[in-house]
Design a protein with these regions (language model features):
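Signature of multi-pass transmembrane helix bundles
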Residues: 1-38, 44, 53, 59, ...
Length: 194
């Protein structure tokens, strides 16, 4: 036990440095913000696997309406939450990193968290989603593969979030924005600056 404590005390400066890294903090905060969605979708996954558990452990089967309707609904909820968790984490990580970057920005300059959140989600879609065409019922249809929008695309989510926020910070620090005439209302001009 003493050797473990000595090891931890010896590594304390390193652990402190790692814990203060704004990118790791953004990943942590991004996941924490997405956690309610992740947990609630896990509940639906548990409900959808209930018929198999009941048949195996209990020795009886649930009614057909449960096996079909309830399971299909629960799988749909799970797929549309965990299936797009990569997009959500891209946005929440970008928002968290924006907060950290804003604390380090010069006075009077700030990055709009909503803008970086939406831009990171779009960047993640560009990085992770592949578009192709397929024949469905004899017609050529444009489709895209959603495999990388979920947990498989988390690395793309982080790249999209970090790149987006850093590009925004670079532009705002150097005042690279779209400037409109003074006659344009402030709310509209601010949207172009962001």
């Amino acid at each position: 036990m003493e050797s473990i404590v000595k090891f931890l005390e010896k590594g304390q400066p390193y652990f402190d440095k790692v814990s203060k890294n704004i990118y790791l903090q953004a990943i942590k905060d991004g996941f924490l913000a997405a956690m309610p969605i992740i947990l609630s979708s896990s509940v639906f996954l548990l409900i959808s696997t209930l018929p198999g558990v009941v048949a195996t452990v209990g020795g009886f089967t649930l009614p057909d309406w449960w096996n079909v309707d309830v399971v299909n609904f629960c799988n749909k909820v799970y797929n549309f939450t965990m299936g797009v968790v990569g997009i959500m984490v891209a946005g929440t990580t970008a928002s968290a990193l924006t907060g950290s970057k804003n604390r380090r920005m010069p006075a009077g300059k700030a990055i709009n968290a909503t803008s970086t959140m939406v831009a990171a989600m779009c960047a993640m879609l560009i990085l992770a989603v592949t578009q192709t065409s397929a024949k469905i019922e004899g017609a050529d249809v444009s489709v895209f593969f959603t495999d990388n929008m979920g947990t498989k695309g988390l690395l793309s989510s982080f790249v999209a979030a970090f790149a987006t926020v850093n590009i925004y910070a670079f532009c705002i620090k150097r005042d690279i924005t779209i400037k409109l005439p003074k006659e344009v209302p402030g709310a509209i001009a601010q949207n172009f600056r962001d």
